[in-house]
């Protein structure tokens, strides 16, 4: 009896000593505002799971001042508790992993990926920042069918399911949108106003293949980029510094705040890179502000202002022998004349509005303007060089009206909209003069001066029908037009004025997509789409006093069939797509009798492929020592062939032009197999680790398929420790890139054999390199 009384007394004493509190709340999706069920809420020894309507109730000790919210489909979030804690409204941000819940913007659907027809690659902020944060190249290359390459830090090429045969520099045939505002130029190329910095990007969606039905001209694909945002209900300041091999250093600072009606973030980035190779530096300074304002329940405003200034060196292509001898060397002409973008400045401003007229009718509109300047000594020899001074300014906008209606068992959604872009470009090119090798060159005689006004318009309409038996049908199309108004300002008795207006015929590009849900966790989709890819400015200008008025756009038709879903209690996600695309009127380079290169329509290709993305969530439990562990694999198979393809090359020994037939050959620059795989691990104590491996098959380097780049493998890894101490969050990390010290060239210069022997195909990438750094975050609210 005494023992029983003593037990009761001790129980009451301990219960009073460790007082309990009950916390209630609701968890919703940040984007859709829909309730999130199955989220795990932990605090001290307390643990519970959110219900079907997102509600939860948890009992925790009084001394516990935070809750950890985790879900397989969302980013883990730590919530600080006030005293006393009110009813908690918690919004979770999708981690873009679970296909049954993740929603996408692609094709203006704004619906679950499982209900969307088409191949779409997804990257969230965590995936974009798995490495050293120099750029998003390592992350983008984990998407099957996507290849991002770099001449140097800040100078990129991107291919989506395609060859870079006609893309000597920059980004071609890929449409880019920032928060639904178009940022590519009217001709489909991209300029320096687009900064691929992981610190300012919140998510990336990649639409593969022709997307002209809703996003204007292009056969390559679309990048939909959204900026990062402040965490819900939080005000914080963050700073970080990273240092690494080959003179890499990076400083980043940001201020973020989120309240009931506003989400504002300001970023500052200063990055320096001396470069792996000689004359291969890359420096940039970026400042930007992004804001999202809720004016009233019917109206949301988004604003961005960004400015980038920088410079980058161009080391030039090397032959295989030169690369094997010393991969860090620059082409001698490039080093002697500091071939580079000596300085670039780019500013972009955009504002967009979402207005809801009713529950069934809304409008989204955005406008932008940008300004850019370049100082660019270029070339590779005394026979090919120049000093370009260029300035660009432009403006444009995009609008869409969305109407929803329900009739019986059929739900309909109609999108009608348009897009307009204008760009004013003035360029003056001089001969390069340099009396002292290794110093900056000077302007010589002017040999080209022009003004180009580019205009692009698109009108689109799309209907989505949710049909009985879990069928989802999408039918749409766009009507696009592009024109160049060129004014030749160079006056000389020996020069032919090539001023003129080049207007391409308007083109209608339709798309049809169908999805069938096979239960809650599996869907099959099929689509057919037409593409229309007008030639960019560098294919219009022959650079010999003539205008290439005979060239016209490439046309493509694409067929896709795919299967996506998740199995094994939402642990295994898979997304598999097969496709076949026929491209006609392919633009090919032609070497002219005077040695210059022009372009013409002279080919067609057949492009067959398979893409697969698999993700397995081994562990997702915030209470376990290893709280998160997932593995993933990305694979692409590409069987691209020239159907009818003839080119011309110049025989320097006989000074004659030779016509070559490459029909039946593999398409230049497309590797048959590419694969990436990785593991991501997080622990309860704050230690985290990730590793990524890449494999790229041998790649044909010229149209004749007589030269190939060797296959190669690359491995990257990162290790870090995160810790929260009251209002401070610390992240210390270190990593290694190219752990195997593989000698490879990420960026290849195709058909370089046309310029003599030995051909300089290679632009060697960095060998084994290391980095380390720290981030500090102060939570003010």
Can you say where each PLM-predicted feature lies in the sequence?
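C-terminal beta-signal and adjacent terminal beta-strands/loops
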Residues: 4, 532, 629, 695-700, ...
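Transmembrane beta-barrel wall of Gram-negative outer-membrane proteins
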Residues: 238, 243-272, 277-315, 341-356, ...
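Short, acidic, small-residue-rich periplasmic hinge/interaction motif at the N-terminus
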Residues: 28, 32, 40-42, 70-74, ...
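Short acidic/polar hinge/loop motifs at secondary-structure boundaries
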Residues: 59, 181-208
């Amino acid at each position: 009896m005494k023992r029983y009384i003593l037990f009761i007394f001790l129980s009451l004493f301990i219960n009073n000593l460790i007082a309990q509190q009950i916390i209630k709340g609701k968890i919703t999706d940040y984007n859709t505002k829909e309730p999130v069920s199955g989220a795990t809420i932990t605090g001290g020894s307390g643990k519970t799971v959110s219900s079907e309507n997102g509600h939860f109730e948890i009992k925790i000790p009084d001394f516990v001042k935070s809750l950890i919210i985790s879900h397989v489909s969302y980013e883990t979030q730590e919530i600080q508790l006030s005293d006393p804690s009110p009813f908690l409204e918690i919004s979770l941000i999708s981690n873009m992993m679970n296909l049954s819940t993740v929603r996408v913007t692609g094709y203006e659907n704004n619906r679950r990926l499982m209900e969307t027809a088409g191949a779409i690659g997804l990257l969230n902020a965590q995936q974009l920042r798995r490495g050293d944060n120099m750029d998003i190249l390592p992350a983008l290359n984990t998407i099957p069918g996507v290849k991002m390459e770099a001449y140097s830090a800040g100078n990129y090429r991107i291919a989506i399911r395609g060859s870079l045969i006609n893309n000597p520099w920059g980004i071609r045939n890929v449409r880019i949108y920032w928060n639904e505002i178009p940022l590519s130029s009217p001709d489909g190329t991209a300029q320096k106003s687009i900064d691929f910095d992981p610190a300012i990007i919140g998510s990336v969606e990649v639409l593969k293949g022709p997307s002209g039905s809703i996003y204007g001209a292009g056969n390559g694909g679309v990048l939909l980029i959204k900026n990062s945002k402040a965490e819900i209900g939080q005000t914080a300041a963050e700073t970080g510094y990273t240092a690494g091999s080959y003179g890499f250093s990076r400083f980043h600072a940001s201020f973020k705040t989120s309240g009931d009606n506003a989400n504002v973030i300001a970023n500052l980035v200063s990055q320096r890179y001396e470069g792996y190779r000689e004359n291969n530096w890359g420096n940039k300074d970026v400042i930007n502000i992004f804001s999202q304002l809720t004016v009233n329940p019917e109206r949301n405003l988004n604003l961005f202002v960004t400015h980038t200034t920088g410079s980058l060196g161009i080391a030039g292509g090397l032959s295989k022998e030169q690369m094997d001898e010393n991969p860090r060397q620059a082409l001698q002409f490039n080093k002697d004349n500091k071939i580079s973008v000596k300085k670039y400045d780019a500013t972009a401003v955009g504002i967009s509005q979402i207005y809801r007229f009713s529950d069934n009718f809304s409008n989204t509109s955005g406008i932008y303007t940008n300004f850019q300047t370049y100082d660019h000594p270029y070339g590779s020899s005394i026979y090919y060089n120049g000093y370009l001074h260029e300035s660009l300014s432009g403006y444009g906008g995009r609008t869409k009206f969305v109407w929803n209606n329900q009739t019986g068992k059929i739900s309909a959604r109609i999108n009608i909209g348009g897009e307009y872009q204008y760009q004013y470009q003035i360029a003056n090119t001089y001969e390069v003069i340099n009396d002292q090798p290794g110093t900056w060159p000077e302007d010589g005689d002017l040999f080209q001066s022009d003004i180009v006004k580019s205009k692009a318009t698109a009108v689109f309409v799309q209907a989505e029908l949710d049909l009985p038996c879990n069928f989802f049908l999408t039918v749409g199309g766009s009507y696009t037009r592009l024109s160049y108004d060129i004014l030749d300002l160079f006056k000389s008795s020996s020069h032919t004025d090539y001023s003129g207006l080049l207007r391409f015929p308007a083109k209608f590009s339709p798309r049809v997509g169908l999805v069938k849900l096979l239960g809650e966790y599996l869907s099959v989709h099929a689509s057919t789409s037409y593409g229309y890819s007008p030639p960019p400015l560098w294919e219009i200008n022959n650079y010999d006093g003539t205008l290439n008025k005979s060239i016209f756009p490439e046309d493509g038709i694409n067929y896709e069939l795919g299967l996506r879903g998740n199995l094994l209690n939402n642990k295994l996600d898979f997304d598999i797509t097969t496709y076949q695309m026929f491209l006609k009127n392919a633009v090919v380079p032609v070497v002219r009798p005077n040695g210059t290169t022009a372009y013409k329509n002279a080919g067609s290709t057949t492009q067959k492929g398979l893409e697969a993305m698999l993700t397995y969530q081994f562990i997702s439990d915030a209470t376990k020592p290893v709280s998160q562990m997932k593995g993933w694999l990305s694979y692409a198979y590409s069987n691209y062939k020239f159907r009818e393809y003839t080119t011309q090359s110049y025989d320097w020994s006989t000074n004659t032009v030779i016509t070559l037939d490459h029909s039946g050959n593999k398409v230049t620059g497309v590797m048959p197999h590419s694969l990436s795989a990785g593991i991501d691990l997080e622990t309860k104590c704050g230690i985290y680790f990730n590793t990524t491996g890449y494999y790229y098959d041998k790649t044909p380097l010229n149209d004749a398929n007589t030269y190939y780049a060797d296959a190669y493998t690359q491995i990257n890894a990162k290790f870090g420790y995160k810790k929260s101490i009251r209002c401070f969050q610390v992240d210390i990390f270190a990593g290694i890139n190219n752990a195997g010290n593989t000698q490879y060239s990420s960026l290849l210069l195709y058909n370089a054999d046309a310029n003599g022997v030995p051909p300089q195909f290679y632009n060697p990438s960095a060998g084994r390199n290391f980095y380390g750094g720290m981030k500090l975050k102060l939570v003010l609210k």
